[in-house]
Amino acid sequence: MAEAERIIGMPENPDVDGTDEGGSTAADAAVNAGRGKRKILALLSVAVVAYLLDLGSKMLVVAKLEHQPPIDIIGDWLQFRAIRNPGAAFGIGEAFTVIFTIIATGVIVVIFRIARKLYSLPWAIALGLLLGGALGNLTDRIFRAPGVFEGAVVDFIAPKNSAVFNLADSAIVCGGILIVILSFKGLDPDGTVHKD
């Protein structure tokens, strides 16, 4: 068991003499701790990229598309159309802007708590997507009109016969789908794999 944990990156707490019951040394724990830090760096890198892509796209949409006719991307099947959405992802729950702001803040806190024990690269990517998307929409809710914690999110990706959304929504959905897949495969954020 200790060998499997060493391979997948779960450090054990070493005993006073520098080895744990499975024979791993304090050096093994230090190497594994380094692997964990790299996963946090991966999470933060994915989050920053997702956040900056979302922020940049929204700035461009507000500057170039707001109060303009939609732009056809793939005929009328996919358009770019600027709207302000006070609700959640895909226009759901417009009357609960403050509640969605609180939920997004809670999601960010939970991600940072999970990140402390993160030893799985796929989980780092999934959580990074969630974090970047949550921060992107939270930024809109805090800084855009009509007011702090009540701001409307800028949405612009408009598939035919579907809700309008943005890159933050896409990152959140992709991160959520990846988490479901990882959970079904039995991979935990700490890198352990279990068979049920």
UniProtKB/Swiss-Prot annotation:
Keywords: Aspartyl protease, Cell membrane, Hydrolase, Membrane, Protease, Transmembrane, Transmembrane helix. It catalyses: Release of signal peptides from bacterial membrane prolipoproteins. Hydrolyzes -Xaa-Yaa-Zaa-|-(S,diacylglyceryl)Cys-, in which Xaa is hydrophobic (preferably Leu), and Yaa (Ala or Ser) and Zaa (Gly or Ala) have small, neutral side chains. It is found in: Cell membrane. It is an enzyme of class 3 (hydrolase). The keyword Isomerase does not apply. It comes from the Bacteria. Its main location: membrane. Residues 1-24 are annotated as: Disordered. GO terms for biological process: proteolysis. One of its GO terms (molecular function) is aspartic-type endopeptidase activity. It is a multi-pass membrane protein. Pathway: Protein modification; lipoprotein biosynthesis (signal peptide cleavage). The keyword Signal does not apply. InterPro entries: Peptidase_A8 (IPR001872). The chain crosses the membrane at residues 40-60, 92-112, 118-138, 164-184. Pfam families: Peptidase_A8. One of its GO terms (cellular component) is plasma membrane. This protein specifically catalyzes the removal of signal peptides from prolipoproteins. Belongs to the peptidase A8 family. This is Lipoprotein signal peptidase. The gene is lspA.
